[in-house]
Amino acid sequence: MIPVVIEQTSRGERSYDIYSRLLKDRIIMLTGPVEDNMANSVIAQLLFLDAQDNTKDIYLYVNTPGGSVSAGLAIVDTMNFIKADVQTIVMGMAASMGTVIASSGTKGKRFMLPNAEYMIHQPMGGTGGGTQQTDMAIAAEHLLKTRHRLEKILAQNAGKTIKQIHKDAERDYWMSAEETLTYGFIDEIMENNELK
C-alpha cells in the first residue's frame, strides 16, 4: 500500500501518493531490485525533472540489492545524458548494479547515510537457456565484456584502476560508509541531513 499525503492549498485539500509528493521536491526513490519496470519509472522521472528545470539538482535516494545490468545501465546513461546534476544518497544498501548507479551521481554530490552499505562483485549470468557449447561460449564472452564495462565505470567513479576494481570485485566486497568514502565511491557521509 502506498501512503497518501494530504496538503492544504488555496483551493482546499489535495492528496498525493507519497512518491508524487516527493517528486515535487525533485526526489526520486530507487528502491528494490533493479529491473526494467523500475528502471523505466526512474528514467521517466529523471527526464521529467530535467525538462522541468535542468538548473536544479535531482535527489536520487538509493536502496537496492542490484539486479539487471541492462536496466541499471539505462539509468546510468540517463543520469549522464541529462543536464541537471543528480545527487545520490545511499540508504540501506547499494549492492551490485546499485553501486554502479549510486557511484554515477554527480561528482561531489554522492552521499551515503552512516549505516548504509556498498557491495561490489562481478556480474552474474547464465547461458540464456541454451545448452549447446556454442551458446555457452557466446554467453561467457558476453559476460566477460559486461564485467569489463562495469569495472571501467566503477574505476572511473572511484578513481581506481580497472585492475584494482577487478581484484576487489572477484567476490562479494562489502563496505561500510566510511570504507566506501575511503574507496572513492562517495564524496561524503550524511548524518541528520548534514554532512559528516
From Swiss-Prot:
Any keyword DNA repair? no
User: GO terms for molecular function, please?
Assistant: ATP-dependent peptidase activity; ATPase binding; serine-type endopeptidase activity
Catalytic activity from the UniProt record: Hydrolysis of proteins to small peptides in the presence of ATP and magnesium. alpha-casein is the usual test substrate. In the absence of ATP, only oligopeptides shorter than five residues are hydrolyzed (such as succinyl-Leu-Tyr-|-NHMec, and Leu-Tyr-Leu-|-Tyr-Trp, in which cleavage of the -Tyr-|-Leu- and -Tyr-|-Trp bonds also occurs)
> Could you name the active-site residues?
96 (nucleophile), 121
Q: Name a single GO cellular component.
A: cytoplasm
According to its UniProt entry, the protein's GO biological process terms are: protein quality control for misfolded or incompletely synthesized proteins
Q: How does it assemble?
A: Fourteen ClpP subunits assemble into 2 heptameric rings which stack back to back to give a disk-like structure with a central cavity, resembling the structure of eukaryotic proteasomes.
Descriptive protein name:
ATP-dependent Clp protease proteolytic subunit
Q: Which organism is it from?
A: Streptococcus pyogenes serotype M28 (strain MGAS6180)
